[in-house]
């Protein structure tokens, strides 16, 4: 049974608006940093840097800038998948999927004080992630998404079952927009993770403000 949306290391309120980056809408690294800053200024309390196509050296350089920006702004910095990069740049944590480095192994690399988020699509996966030491979960896909074509949507009942089963914060991810976010009301969520609903917008800061307010209205 869930508590009040907190873990030992992260408060659910920090997860109200979880920004996940995508280079598709940034011309270069400078533009990406500007977008991240705007998302934070609009209310994002945690940002995940996701890079699937950069080489190691370029990713490392970008991650250093990213972590420095998040520290300056006072928000949580998460690196997607790359545990070695997260450790090297001193990020606040890492997010891993079911097919990425297991949460237990990530904990071994990062130590006890860093945040580890895990993607889950079922109660079984959620409970396994919690048992392995996850600090929060990203569940979905909540809706059909163009960001990850292979991410099949899960039902609202499944989301509710996950949030009821675990004691750590949970955010929904996948196809979430200002038009459908309220459909997640009553699911026991601590927040939403968004990609295109934020970074594909012309005014990222305004989009963040709107999404934060909507997320606040449906949280838990």
Where are these regions (language model features)?
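Glycine-rich beta-strand-to-loop/alpha-helix junction loops that act as flexible
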Residues: 139, 171-176, 192-196
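Conserved N-terminal beta1-alpha1 strand-loop-helix module at the mouth
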Residues: 2-101, 108-136, 151-154, 161, ...
């Amino acid at each position: 049974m869930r508590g009040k949306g907190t873990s030992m290391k992260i408060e659910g309120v920090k997860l109200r608006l979880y920004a996940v980056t995508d280079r598709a809408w940034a011309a270069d690294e400078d533009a990406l940093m500007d977008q991240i800053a705007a998302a934070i200024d609009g209310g994002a309390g945690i940002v995940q840097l996701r890079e699937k196509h950069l080489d190691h050296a370029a990713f490392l350089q970008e991650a250093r800038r990213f972590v420095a920006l998040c520290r300056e702004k006072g928000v949580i910095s998460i690196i997607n998948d790359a545990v070695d990069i997260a450790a090297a740049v001193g990020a606040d944590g890492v997010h891993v999927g079911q097919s990425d480095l297991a949460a237990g192994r990530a904990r071994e690399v990062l130590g006890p004080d860093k945040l580890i988020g895990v993607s889950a699509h079922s109660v079984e996966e959620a409970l396994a992630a919690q048992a392995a030491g996850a600090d929060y979960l990203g569940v979905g896909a909540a809706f059909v998404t163009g960001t990850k074509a292979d991410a099949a949507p899960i039902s609202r009942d499944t989301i509710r079952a996950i949030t009821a089963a675990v004691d750590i914060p949970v955010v929904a991810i996948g196809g979430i927009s200002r038009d459908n976010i309220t459909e997640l009301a009553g699911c026991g969520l601590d927040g939403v993770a968004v990609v295109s609903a934020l970074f594909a917008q012309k005014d990222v800061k305004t989009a963040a403000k709107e999404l934060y307010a909507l997320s606040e209205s449906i949280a838990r």
